[in-house]
Amino acid sequence: MSGNKRGSRASCPHRGAECLLPWAALNLQGFQLLLLHPSATAMMDVSELGESARYLRQGYQEMTKVHTIPWDGKKRVWVPDEQDAYVEAEVKSEATGGRVTVETKDQKVLMVREAELQPMNPPRFDLLEDMAMMTHLNEASVLHNLRQRYARWMIYTYSGLFCVTINPYKWLPVYTASVVAAYKGKRRSDSPPHIYAVADNAYNDMLRNRDNQSMLITGESGAGKTVNTKRVIQYFAIVAALGDGPGKKAQFLATKTGGTLEDQIIEANPAMEAFGNAKTLRNDNSSRFGKFIRIHFGPSGKLASADIDSYLLEKSRVIFQLPGERSYHVYYQILSGRKPELQDMLLLSMNPYDYHFCSQGVITVDNMNDGEELIATDHAMDILGFSVDEKCACYKIVGALLHFGNMKFKQKQREEQAEADGTESADKAAYLMGVSSGDLLKGLLHPRVRVGNEYVTKGQSVEQVVFAVGALAKATYDRLFRWLVSRINQTLDTKLPRQFFIGVLDIAGFEIFEFNSFEQLCINFTNEKLQQFFNQHMFVLEQEEYKREGIDWVFIDFGLDLQPCIDLIEKPLGILSILEEECMFPKASDASFRAKLYDNHAGKSPNFQQPRPDKKRKYQAHFEVVHYAGVVPYSIVGWLEKNKDPLNETVVPIFQKSQNRLLATLYENYAGSCSTEPPKSGVKEKRKKAASFQTVSQLHKENLNKLMTNLRATQPHFVRCIVPNENKTPGVMDAFLVLHQLRCNGVLEGIRICRQGFPNRLLYTDFRQRYRILNPSAIPDDTFMDSRKATEKLLGSLDLDHTQYQFGHTKVFFKAGLLGVLEELRDQRLAKVLTLLQARSRGRLMRLEYQRLLGGRDALFTIQWNIRAFNAVKNWSWMKLFFKMKPLLRSAQAEEELAALRAELRGLRGALAAAEAKRQELEETHVSITQEKNDLALQLQAEQDNLADAEERCHLLIKSKVQLEGKVKELSERLEDEEEVNADLAARRRKLEDECTELKKDIDDLELTLAKAEKEKQATENKVKNLTEEMAALDESVARLTKEKKALQEAHQQALGDLQAEEDRVSALTKAKLRLEQQVEDLECSLEQEKKLRMDTERAKRKLEGDLKLTQESVADAAQDKQQLEEKLKKKDSELSQLSLRVEDEQLLGAQMQKKIKELQARAEELEEELEAERAARARVEKQRAEAARELEELSERLEEAGGASAGQREGCRKREAELGRLRRELEEAALRHEATVAALRRKQAEGAAELGEQVDSLQRVRQKLEKEKSELRMEVDDLAANVETLTRAKASAEKLCRTYEDQLSEAKIKVEELQRQLADASTQRGRLQTESGELSRLLEEKECLISQLSRGKALAAQSLEELRRQLEEESKAKSALAHAVQALRHDCDLLREQHEEEAEAQAELQRLLSKANAEVAQWRSKYEADAIQRTEELEEAKKKLALRLQEAEEGVEAANAKCSSLEKAKLRLQTESEDVTLELERATSAAAALDKKQRHLERALEERRRQEEEMQRELEAAQRESRGLGTELFRLRHGHEEALEALETLKRENKNLQEEISDLTDQVSLSGKSIQELEKTKKALEGEKSEIQAALEEAEGALELEETKTLRIQLELSQVKAEVDRKLAEKDEECANLRRNHQRAVESLQASLDAETRARNEALRLKKKMEGDLNDLELQLGHATRQATEAQAATRLMQAQLKEEQAGRDEEQRLAAELHEQAQALERRASLLAAELEELRAALEQGERSRRLAEQELLEATERLNLLHSQNTGLLNQKKKLEADLAQLSGEVEEAAQERREAEEKAKKAITDAAMMAEELKKEQDTSAHLERMKKTLEQTVRELQARLEEAEQAALRGGKKQVQKLEAKVRELEAELDAEQKKHAEALKGVRKHERRVKELAYQAEEDRKNLARMQDLVDKLQSKVKSYKRQFEEAEQQANTNLAKYRKAQHELDDAEERADMAETQANKLRARTRDALGPKHKE
């Protein structure tokens, strides 16, 4: 007995869900267990593990040896090492200069920086099972601990809250049944680290917390995730398996196979691994798909069911493998030959190299026996309940794919068409697939393609056929794998009650290969999201909960945010988004995809890099992504095709009709672009989008988002798998590789937060309930105490370290390990209580046993006394006599009585026999009569019951028949409406598809053009920037030269004033005249050089334009014509007049061409009418031909029935049939020719229009260039004329001065002495005048800058005010539209308004706070409202499948009824769990209080945000008022400075022109907005029609479906409205912020300008008169040039328009007209032939008149149907007209956008030309400045020489030298003339510089306006494109709904027929029953 007790004690721990139950709820068995087990084991006994012990925990001796190693804590450190990462070392000397001398274990002495040292842990911390217990936590210590444990094959180690496992690359005996039993129910701290411990912890948390759990097993590829996943599933299957009893019966009924549920869960892995695992370079058994396995448990924790979700199978591996890799295991298992019957069935050999699809890499795997694996796979499928047919079908598809890969094709000679190179493989594949080999090859080689409304057979090249074969193979294998998973789920779904689940995630690990493609990006993106989830859960949410609960905690940023990389991949304009966008464009390629990637991310995202050049790479990399696990180079080859995943839509219908039922099932739901039939009903798995729109990346993102949602709704448990080395060598650890994985996985950070934080927490109520037993006296029962106070009091009464826990608002938090201490104390307390209880119970039992023994003793005493008394008297003599006499006393009397009794007995026996015989006879009669009565009564009752039931059923059937007839009638009417709508929508869809294709092409062209314009604009901006910088440098040099020159001018003026009387001025002026003439000649030479430079520039520009136009059609002729025109227009102005004459002639010719064009258009319309008539005639002929064919068939049948006809009649029939065949062929040829003719006409018309457009563009460019050259030439002529006039005036004044100077020569001698004095004064005045001149020039420049700033400030202010006003109007419109939308919703308006305000005011500052609140709500709901979450998930799934469920209306009703019954069951189950709900309500109440508090905090924050917005609005209004005030002040200042601002009139006029252009653009934008509003109205109308259709369908589905659909639709509309509100509010906020910033900048600029204007006011007044003359001259010149330019532009524009109209259309229209005429004649000839043939047919028809009479009835019916079709066609035509109007409107908007784009291009080109001109002028000014510099130096030298000569002249004058004085005077006059000329030159140069400055500013402003216009055009194009996409989606949805309605109608019709048949049968049966009843009752009534 004691032995049994000990054994049972060891197997019943006191930890688990049972400990939570109160004592009163314990059953009898649990009570007896508590009595027998007084204590639980505190530590696992290693002996329980058997031979597995040494792989999990070292023995005592080994640990003692390790822990007692001598150690010096101050000197032992870790130092970095190049080989082992870190090595152990000893410090030899202290730090000197930041370096320390250390000695390693191998006697090496190193000098290491002190910062690189890491302290070692004492030896007693070696081989730690939990690395969070280390004293020194660093990389080296963690690596050392893992390395030591791995060397002893201990692969599992705890790292804080999660577990780290290292792949051993060998089998270890740590997964046996004894190990599973040893870990069952153990605490984590009691057992060695193991994956079983983590699984058991999750299982116990599920039972204890009543919450769903998940286990995330992550790591790189080859880290051992799959093996650990299998072990976890094995553990759950064994621990939570169903026991014996009723549950066993339920399990047997659920599984329906020989295998139990736990066996099936375990065997699901081998089946999926065979089809989904393969060998890679890093892993021999790599999972090439992801799976999330949910294991469901019942309320008691027993196994209930399971299901599997799979993610992203690597389909490309089916047809391609890298060297060193292998395809999926199932191929090689089948080819292993272990089951020879498979080879025979699949027609396969045993050599994998015979099959291309599976032999591109290796074919074997070390340590893997493919034959044994095949047996395991087959056994697993048997356990999972696969039938033999299902297995054979599965194997056949795999074998067919092998044959599929061996199909070979070759190119036909002299053709691009491919043909089959042998059909053996195709025949085998078709045989296994159950299809026709000929149809399969025909579908591959000649697929049918849909062109408009018809199908055309298309030829394929060899490459296209090979690609189609590969795509079909990949799609078939992928669908086979998904079917396998769904089939396994079907088996594992046992329908047992389930309450919780544990999800196990096994996803493909992070991969970095030499060749990384689209699959690697998806896999690595998934791992990136999972790592971010780990970081968020471990670090961010953990610390946020501390803050939320009020824990004293400082937030630690661990720097592990992976969101930038995730945003790079999945956000809008991310990698996947760009990939999806490219997949929508038909002309997209890998190159365009790569270009978009670099345009959007190169240099903008730190995680996106260009690939580094590496010669070792075998494959090209196009970009690199910085992932958390490393930098991965990706190759984008084939990404577009992989993402679109197209299929040959001719072969798919062949598969759908396959004899192989499994293959037909796989493609049952496929609906491509060529499919016309709706998908079959009754299938649960539906596609959410059409096949052409559902890309692989979209599907992967949706599945990944679902997975992340499921994970967030669970409590996660993390297991980190580590790859020890790249070579898969057991026992070898690459330190750097392991360190890299530890850093990426956040292992150190997880240990750190586990040590510093509070990883364990409990609600106060839970803690009080569980641990009150530790000190019951602390919480008395007779008084009420709050749970928190009770917890504080209880913990305070215990002997614990009070720093190890903290109290939050709702929970108590514990440091790591403290909860384990409390559990041990609780176990001890429970052991003590149970010991006392056992003692009392055993005493009671022993006392009862003692009382029983006492009663037995008394009974024994009584028996013993009686026996002793008998023994005492038995030998007494009298007693012996008594014994002998007593039997003899009555013997005689007894004999007499016995004889009498015997006689009486004989008499009675005779009477009894007679009575018995009579009684038996009567009883038999009675029984027979009674039986007959009962039989008749029962028969009567049965007949009456049958009659009543039959009548009742008859009534019910009649009622149901009436109802169904009404329903059918209603559905028939609705079907007719739907068919009409469907036909209309189909026509509209086809029309829109064509229009959309054209619009897409136009949009592509626009995008290319806009991109080119953007590049040109950027180049122009760069040029303008460079020119601005050069202008600034020139300004500085000119200012410096001006100052120096002015100083020289002052000196020379003084000198000239002193030498006025010199006679030599005449000769000096003559020399000056000659010099000026020479300068004129120099200027003419420079002008010629500038012309040459300009011609070179023009030639370069023409070359660039030619390069740009090479990509367009017919550009060579246009370029040649343009070049010829440019050469002609460059010669002289006289040629312009000749060109004008030619233009007039061309105008006349253009008018004539216009007339001809109109005539040709009229002729084209006539031809179109003739074509329509021809079509009608063709239709009539076709109809007559069909009738004739039908009549001929009837005649032939009758003739055969009559018994044979004559040879002549048969010959006539054959002739008629031949004639009919010929007629049919000719009709088809005529139709094809007609269509080709129409297409050619349209194509030629489009080409002509395009050529005309190109000619117009070229002529416009020529006109612009001519205008520019003309204006330049006129300016040059004016300049030359001005120079000539100046020279003439100078010559006249020089002659006059000669006479004057001759008179004054006598006075010169007297003034020589005075000149000497004045020369000294001049030197002093020169400095003063020089400073004044510099100051004046500076003031002048400041004035000009202020003027330009004021003008720009005004423009900016006006623009900002206008933009603000427009945005306010748009915002008010948007608000009114939103209010209308909110009123239309059937939802609570107040709730929607609150959501609107919350979403509107939750800006960037509160976004993080709101996300935290959402996370809190999700966490609370996931913990305490599991059932509600489950129902929410079901509603979400129902919401997503709503559109697809419309195809299964009746099935949906049944599903809804089933759902109602399940809800009723759930309601009953919830009622039984009222106690748990009460507890959860208490928790929820506390949680709600916390959430209310958080909500109040959020409301306060939102109120603060709202207040800030109001303040900002008030500031904006104040700024606007200030702006208006500043505008008034600016106007006043300008009024005061009108004379100073006259120079800006030209700028104002140009600004006015620009404003007019802006207003025009604004009007165009408003028109576009109106058109967009009209499109919105159309969209709303379509949405209204859609909602009406949906409402009608929902009424047919029933009340429950109606309510559910309304709820889901409202939720969808709410989410859409919410998203729209978010987007609009974000746009408004951004616009407001931009306006605020622009306004602030404008105000600051105006303020600065105002201050500068105030300072410069006085200086401007002084300079006003001086500037007046210059400004007037500039204004006159500019006005003259502007008028000339305007006139030239008008003339050139008129000329270009006329040339465009005449030159483009003349030849083309004539050619088209001729072709149309010829085609019309040909059609007429064909019509005459057809008419003759029709006459022959009529003759033949007259012979068959009798047959036609029999078909007249059918013809009448056909006529009625034709009338019906005619009415439908009328409706279609009306709808077509409406759609054409809509499309015309869209086309108009696109044309407007294109026109605006062209205008922007012209402006950009004009800006480029102006910039080039500015560059030339600047170069000229630079040359002039250089010349002036040289002249300056020459003049300085001359001045010095003049001074020397003047001194000599003075001496000579003193001596009386007259000749010397004359020479000096001549020299002075010469210098004076040169100075005047230089002054004029400088003035002209200064004017030119100022003009260029103004021109540069104008160009900059114009470039900015062009950029804004381009941005607006791009926005308009994007909006139009989005509209087109939305309309296309709407039409597709409408078409799908129409197909659904048609299917419903057919189903309802079928049900009606069935009901009618059942009603007829029931009525017949009822009549029979009535007759039988009357027949049975009739005789009885007569009796």
UniProtKB/Swiss-Prot annotation:
One of its GO terms (molecular function) is ATP binding. Residues 72-122 form the Myosin N-terminal SH3-like domain. It comes from the Eukaryota. Expression does not vary in normal patients compared to patients with acute monocytic leukemia. The cardiac alpha isoform is a 'fast' ATPase myosin, while the beta isoform is a 'slow' ATPase. Residues 830-859 form the IQ domain. This is Myosin-7B. The gene is MYH7B. It comes from Homo sapiens. Its main location: membrane. Muscle myosin is a hexameric protein that consists of 2 heavy chain subunits (MHC), 2 alkali light chain subunits (MLC) and 2 regulatory light chain subunits (MLC-2). GO terms for biological process: regulation of CAMKK-AMPK signaling cascade; regulation of cardiac muscle cell contraction; regulation of cytosolic calcium ion concentration.
